[in-house]
Amino acid sequence: MTKFIFVTGGVVSSLGKGITAASLAAVLEARGVNVTMTKMDPYINVDPGTMSPFQHGEVFVTEDGAETDLDLGYYERFLRHSKMSKSNNFTSGRIYQNVLNKERRGEYLGGTVQVIPHITDEIKSKILASGEGYDVAIIEIGGTVGDIESLPFMEAVRQMQVELGRHRAMLMHLTLVPYIASAGETKTKPTQHSVKELRSIGLQPDILICRSDHHISPDNRRKIALFTNVEERAVIMCEDAQSIYQIPRTLHEQDLDDLICERFGLDLPEADLSDWDKVVEAQLNPESTVTVAMVGKYVELPDAYKSINEALLHAGITHKVDVKIDYIDAERLEDDDSLLAQLHNADAILVPGGFGERGTMGKIKAITYARENKVPYLGICLGMQLAVIEYARNVLHIDANSSEFDRKTAEPIIGLITEWLDERGELQIRSDDSDLGGTMRLGAQQAELVAGSKLAQIYGATNITERHRHRYEMNNRYIEPLEQAGMTISGYSAKQHLVESVELADHPWFVAVQFHPEFTSSPRGGHPLFNSFVKAAKNYSEAK
């Protein structure tokens, strides 16, 4: 039967619950445990699909087309054998929506619908369903202990601990042990109060993960254990690390996996973390450095491009290259030519996905620079659409645009997808008036690459599967004039013949794709497209 480890956070947000939980999952997986992970988000949005990247960061897309929290990206990157799906992320909004739909159908037989038991029962059913078929399920609860929004989730966890018993449920709590510079010491009181807050709602942590930017002394560890009623060996020190991929080793060296296996009655071999050691060794000991200019409109918050950042890091690990990302505000680039110096200093240029017209002229400016100066260029999603628009305007000399930016454009080289088949093979129909949430081409889709194209050479195959998140596509009636002018259409969707990729034959490395390759990159091997891109950047740097 599935065992559950619930993960909560206290004192402050952004402690790294997702990374810590994923690191623990990686260690358990290295011991042969079949493990999965789920993120519970207390906000009322049904999913993060329409949330501002400035507030929420990246939206991570799963194979089955779910728009989810960026922590699911960490889960997939740390785990070898588990892929996330719609069942691995749910919000308060989704829970309430499900309960209200049941009430409308009369499933509660006219009863008064309440937070307890109806909302908590729905949460419990989702948790249990997400763990089916696995040895261990790690359940991360978003937010911070004490937040009013998370109380129904905390109550559901409390009930599950009682119902499942000690041998099937554990609670792991992350907390901050701050260092007070003026006093020259770390302070345990915030951790004590965080656990006190948990205990006030009926939850006692079995494991404490103590986050700090300074060393925590053995005396403070004993003090934390004494005043939080947690075994001393279950008080785990987790200081800031040079690489997040060091965390599995950090947890393992403090015997956290042994403690969990003992509690759950799991007799398993020792964890083999040699793969993680190799990743860390390559990351911390690069042999060269390249700079990638990322031109976007959410660059003030790097988490908005978390999977791309990680994919570039993974490619750097693969080639033993330190990939430095120089973020350029696309909107500022439109009018500030001084920012062109950053493009000049870059070894490669990347334009990521995005929505809306704001900043597009700055991105087009960067694409023109990359094309004319033979700088390696990678366009993703909107980055491909703008590469097509740039080429049409500056090479074909037509006033091309996207109907997303100008519905009345005379040359709609990019247009709204009105019909397509989703990941289940079901017909989806959209219009300009459709809801924004959940109305895109989402999830894993098959594509066919043109034999002999650069992209086919990069993948080593002509049939690939990549994840998508977009509602606009290239207009196929422009394929012939573009190809006659020198742009190669190198990939098409397998069923609808939608354009998936373009490239330039007279450019050392100019590739743009409609899909999102960053979602499937791994620290153990990277992703073929990003690996090739970083290699091209390295070659460009060496040839300067």
Swiss-Prot record:
Note: CTPSs have evolved a hybrid strategy for distinguishing between UTP and CTP. The overlapping regions of the product feedback inhibitory and substrate sites recognize a common feature in both compounds, the triphosphate moiety. To differentiate isosteric substrate and product pyrimidine rings, an additional pocket far from the expected kinase/ligase catalytic site, specifically recognizes the cytosine and ribose portions of the product inhibitor.
Stored InterPro entries: Class_I_gatase-like, CTP_synthase, CTP_synthase_N, GATASE, GATase1_CTP_Synthase, P-loop_NTPase
Family: Belongs to the CTP synthase family.
Record-level GO cellular component terms: cytosol
Activity: how regulated: Allosterically activated by GTP, when glutamine is the substrate; GTP has no effect on the reaction when ammonia is the substrate. The allosteric effector GTP functions by stabilizing the protein conformation that binds the tetrahedral intermediate(s) formed during glutamine hydrolysis. Inhibited by the product CTP, via allosteric rather than competitive inhibition.
Binding residues annotated for Mg(2+), in chain numbering: D71, E140
Catalytic activity: UTP + L-glutamine + ATP + H2O = CTP + L-glutamate + ADP + phosphate + 2 H(+); L-glutamine + H2O = L-glutamate + NH4(+); UTP + NH4(+) + ATP = CTP + ADP + phosphate + 2 H(+)
Binding site for ATP: S14, L15, G16, K17, G18, I19, D71
Originating species: Psychrobacter arcticus (strain DSM 17307 / VKM B-2377 / 273-4)
EC number of this enzyme: 6.3.4.2
Gene Ontology molecular functions: ATP binding; CTP synthase activity; glutaminase activity; identical protein binding; metal ion binding
Name listed for the protein in its UniProt record: CTP synthase
Binding locations of UTP: S13, K187, T188, K189, P190, T191, Q192, K223
Positions contributing to L-glutamine binding: G354, L382, G383, M384, Q385, E404, R471
Positions with a binding annotation for CTP: S13, D147, I148, E149, K187, T188, K189, P190, T191, Q192, K223
Pathway given in the UniProt record: Pyrimidine metabolism; CTP biosynthesis via de novo pathway; CTP from UDP: step 2/2
Keywords per UniProt: ATP-binding, Glutamine amidotransferase, Ligase, Magnesium, Metal-binding, Nucleotide-binding, Pyrimidine biosynthesis
Listed PROSITE patterns: GATASE_TYPE_1
PANTHER family associated with the record: CTP SYNTHASE, CTP SYNTHASE-RELATED
Oligomeric form and interacting partners: Homotetramer.
Catalytic residues identified in the record: C381, H516, E518
Region (Amidoligase domain) location: 1-266
GO annotation terms (biological process): 'de novo' CTP biosynthetic process; pyrimidine nucleobase biosynthetic process
Domain Glutamine amidotransferase type-1: 291-543
Protein's job: Catalyzes the ATP-dependent amination of UTP to CTP with either L-glutamine or ammonia as the source of nitrogen. Regulates intracellular CTP levels through interactions with the four ribonucleotide triphosphates.
